[in-house]
């Protein structure tokens, strides 16, 4: 078996336009395609993260809220590798996105921090 890369990650959002604005205009991902699927009554937005990875956004009517405390099984957070955590945090803050203080990962010794998407999904920056 050769699982060589992560092709895509799919998340469900409560507000399509807010999620699209966040991931495209604030994080800079490019739109591959977007479709309204009337049979499912939802939007599907495919975004290019980099040459190897895509992010799928599904916007459904009234999805249940994300469980943060206590944490539930499933995706805990989504982490993005960056060259400079400080520079990326600066750019995010200039876009109105709050970030936690930068800290050093106890295991890797690398700088990292967290912020959240509009639905509260924790997103990590890691050098």
Outline where the language-model segments fall:
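Mid-chain, well-packed structural core segment of small domains
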Residues: 71-86
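Exposed loop/turn and edge beta-strand positions of beta-sandwich/beta-sheet ligand-binding modules
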Residues: 41, 74, 109
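Short amphipathic alpha-helices within nucleic acid-binding modules
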Residues: 22, 86-91
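A short, acidic/glycine-rich surface segment
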Residues: 32-34, 41-43, 62-68, 101
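N-terminal beta-strand motif that seeds the catalytic metal site of vicinal oxygen chelate
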Residues: 1-18, 75-78
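Core segments of cupin and vicinal oxygen chelate
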Residues: 12-54
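Short, charged/polar surface micro-motifs in flexible loops or helix N-caps
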Residues: 50-54, 62-63, 85-86
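Vicinal oxygen chelate
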Residues: 1-2, 35, 46-48, 89-127
């Amino acid at each position: 078996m050769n699982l060589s890369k992560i092709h895509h990650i799919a998340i469900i959002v409560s507000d399509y336009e807010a999620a699209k604005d966040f991931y495209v205009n604030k994080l800079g991902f490019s739109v591959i395609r977007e479709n309204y699927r009337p049979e499912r009554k939802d939007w599907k937005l495919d975004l290019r993260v980099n040459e190897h990875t895509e992010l799928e956004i599904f916007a459904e009517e009234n999805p249940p809220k994300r469980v943060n405390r206590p944490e539930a099984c499933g995706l805990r957070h989504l982490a993005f590798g960056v060259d400079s955590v400080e520079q990326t945090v600066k750019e995010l803050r200039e876009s109105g996105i709050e970030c936690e203080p930068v800290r050093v990962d106890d295991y890797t010794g690398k700088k990292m921090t967290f912020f959240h998407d509009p639905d509260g999904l924790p997103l990590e920056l890691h050098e």
